[in-house]
Amino acid sequence: YDAQGETFCALDHAALIWEQGHSIAIMGESGSGKSTLARLMIGLERPSEGRILINGVDTTKWSLREWRKYRGKIQAVFQDAGGTLNPAWSTSKNVEEALVNLTDLSPSQRKNRIAELMEQTGLSKNLLDTPVRRLSGGEQRRLALLRSLSISPEFLILDEVTAGLDLISTEAVLQLLEKYEQEHDCAYLVITHDLQIASRLCEVIYEIEHGKITKKAVR
């Protein structure tokens, strides 16, 4: 993209392997290209040049219908979770909207699914009817995680998902992610500055610098 009249390459031949059931982490300094890579993978941004290959398919040529089918399998939780939620809707409606669009669950099944995940993410059931704009930043991030997990994705991008959470909330989120991965064979792409979190959740850790993958470590 262009910055102050100069062309800046956010990513340059950043290739990595991410397979179902195998979680990976991306670590690097701010501005290294971590979040840009995640947003490109889920179609929230388009590359100015080059291609994005997922299972050998160039997603830059996908139609809106193809992206919708893909998003039933992959979800993302970004650090600014509030930007992906409707602030005027209640917590339950934000989650139920995803369940209506991307699952075949009945109304009663949707209600039970939301209640179950509210408990697992440490969100009080008293917040079910609370507008999202009245939630704290940490509560919004846990709600975004809850919504993503509710549709049982095969792949989940986690962009600094525990940043700013207290120790108790962080541990609750990590335990939930570990349990979900084991039960559903889900693969995470974890973007974090915390090596302990990366090592706990992931088998492979990539380091990115100036838009390029520079290191790879296998746990």
Q: Which sequence ranges carry the predicted segments?
A:
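The feature captures the beta-strand-to-loop junction immediately N-terminal to the Walker
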Residues: 27-29
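Q-loop/switch helix immediately C-terminal to the Walker
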Residues: 80, 88-101
